[in-house]
Amino acid sequence: MKVSVLITLAVLGVMFLLTSAEERGSDQMDSPAWLKSMEIIFQSEERECRWLFGGCEKDSDCCEHLGCRRAKPSWCGWDFTVGK
């Protein structure tokens, strides 16, 4: 969710830069340098575990209280445990 919000804000920022550059009549936009500095937003977020229904290969890929279901495709499902 956090990543999708950041990507949406980045896309809106790029659209704003492009429209403002067109309004100024500028042939040289400085947006490519700005986009390179924002590259980290577009990289996938590394997680320490997979959430419910996330893809997995083994139980340790899934978050706490989840286990890897071996049905094809493999996914993380609740392992019927509770607690903190």
Swiss-Prot record:
Location of this chain's protein in the cell: Secreted
Positions of the pro-segment in this chain: 22-47
UniProt note: domains: The presence of a 'disulfide through disulfide knot' structurally defines this protein as a knottin.
Keywords (A to Z) from UniProt: Amidation, Disulfide bond, Ion channel impairing toxin, Knottin, Secreted, Signal, Toxin
Source organism: Chilobrachys guangxiensis
Tissue-level expression: Expressed by the venom gland.
General function of this protein: Probable ion channel inhibitor.
Full protein name: U21-theraphotoxin-Cg1a 1
